[in-house]
Design a protein with these regions (language model features):
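Conserved GNAT-fold acetyl-CoA-binding loop/helix
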Residues: 21-46
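C-terminal "cap" of GNAT-fold acetyltransferases
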Residues: 132, 137-143, 149, 155-188
């Protein structure tokens, strides 16, 4: 399968949201009952600030977006435009971890390396801005991908929703690889 990685644009928003909805329904739905899947939409989805910041990637098969994800230099850990608890505060790369955010793959393209490809792009971009640590909040569906890519569990958290249904997640982190730092700083 040949794919192309590129930065997302605001023109991609509708297609990204449709992909996220499908991914949540089918991939998260393999772990949760229907009520918990519906509640998940409150804490997941597209944060267009990532697109505006130039830190959100898409993976295309032909002209079709089959995966997406990004990283952030801002304090928000997870959630879409509609989610509460967001913060636009800029992180200090010397003392804080860059955030890996909003990773989604079309269910028909799952487990084909798309998530790993997006993670590598996020890592290289964050390293280029001086970040040495990556952190994220993983869903139960995403946790195996992150573990396979060197992220370790910091803590298990239950994220509350307005429906009164908690969504089990895992806060995970890892250092930026030496190769990403070298790629971000040629000669370094």
């Amino acid at each position: 399968m040949t794919t192309t990685l590129r930065l997302a644009t605001l023109d991609d928003v509708d297609e990204l949201r449709a992909l996220m909805t499908l991914s949540i329904r089918r991939l998260i739905g393999a772990y949760f009952d229907a009520d918990r899947v519906e509640a998940s939409y409150e804490i997941m989805g597209l944060d267009t600030q990532l697109i505006e910041d130039g830190t959100y990637f898409t993976v295309l098969s032909g002209e079709r977006i089959v995966g997406c994800g990004g990283w952030s230099r801002r304090a928000t850990m997870f959630g879409g435009d509609h989610s509460g608890g967001r913060s636009s505060r800029l992180l200090d790369p010397a003392t804080e971890a860059a955030r890996v955010r909003a990773m989604y793959t079309h269910p028909d393209f799952a487990r084909r390396g798309i998530g790993t490809r997006v993670l590598a792009a996020c890592e290289a971009a964050a390293a280029a801005e001086g970040f040495t640590v990556l952190e994220l909040v993983a869903t139960v569906a995403g946790e195996p991908l992150y573990a396979a890519n060197g992220f370790t569990l910091v803590e298990r958290i239950d994220v509350p929703t307005a429906r009164g249904i908690a969504i089990p997640c895992a806060r995970m982190r890892r250092g930026v690889s030496v190769n990403a730092v070298r790629g971000a700083n040629p000669g370094g």
